[in-house]
């Protein structure tokens, strides 16, 4: 279990309320696939991923990006028990999909970049970023739990 300060809880929940998951999700997953092209191997059923434009316009990428961000809502709702909230997803990504757990960190970085670009430095201040990155690190750890 993670010990969250009241300020961190407030920052995470407050920021989450400002994030358009249906906008950030597709952007973040597309960014991951463009910036870290080796991650594309996990999305072979998504169709054309041959260029950045193809990735950005790919409806399967957009749909899965939304799914990922809606999945993060589970962590926001379960701040005190993120690891258990993500047990089934961890098992699926480890045992069925064989996703390199470092890819979760890469996607978390892309989510952070997209949120920062959308909300700007006034809303996404350094202290908000610190809490959000701690939150994403806990989610990444929970997703990687079955790998250990």
UniProtKB/Swiss-Prot annotation:
Question: What disulfide bonds does the UniProt entry report for this chain?
Answer: none
Kindly state which keywords UniProt assigns to this record, in alphabetical order: Heme, Iron, Metal-binding, Oxygen transport, Transport
| PROSITE patterns recorded | GLOBIN
Cited InterPro entries: Globin (IPR000971), Globin-like_sf (IPR009050), Globin/Proto (IPR012292), Hemoglobin_b (IPR002337), Hemoglobin_oxygen_transport (IPR050056)
| Occurrences of domain Globin (ranges) | 3-148
Q: What GO annotations for molecular function exist for this entry?
A: haptoglobin binding; heme binding; metal ion binding; organic acid binding; oxygen binding; oxygen carrier activity; peroxidase activity
- Enumerate the residues binding heme b: 64, 93
Q: Which GO terms describe its cellular component?
A: blood microparticle; haptoglobin-hemoglobin complex; hemoglobin complex
Question: What does the tissue specificity note say?
Answer: Red blood cells.
Q: Pfam families under this entry?
A: Globin (PF00042)
Highest rank taxon of the organism? Eukaryota
Provide the assembly information: Heterotetramer of two alpha chains and two beta chains.
Q: Which family does it belong to?
A: Belongs to the globin family.
This chain's protein is named Hemoglobin subunit beta
Q: Which organism is it from?
A: Salmo salar (Atlantic salmon)
């Amino acid at each position: 279990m993670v010990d969250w300060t009241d300020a961190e809880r407030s920052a995470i929940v407050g920021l989450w309320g400002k994030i358009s998951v249906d906008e950030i999700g597709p952007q973040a997953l597309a960014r991951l696939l463009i910036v870290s092209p080796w991650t594309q191997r996990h999305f072979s059923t998504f169709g054309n991923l041959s260029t950045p434009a193809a990735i950005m316009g790919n409806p399967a990428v957009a749909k899965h990006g939304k799914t990922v961000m809606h999945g993060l809502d589970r962590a926001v709702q379960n701040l005190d028990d993120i690891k258990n909230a993500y047990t089934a997803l961890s098992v699926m990504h480890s045992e069925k999909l064989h996703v390199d757990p470092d890819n979760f960190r890469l996607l978390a970085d892309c989510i952070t970049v997209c949120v920062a670009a959308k909300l700007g430095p006034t809303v996404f201040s350094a202290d908000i970023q610190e809490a959000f990155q701690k939150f994403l690190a806990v989610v990444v750890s929970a997703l990687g739990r079955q790998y250990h």
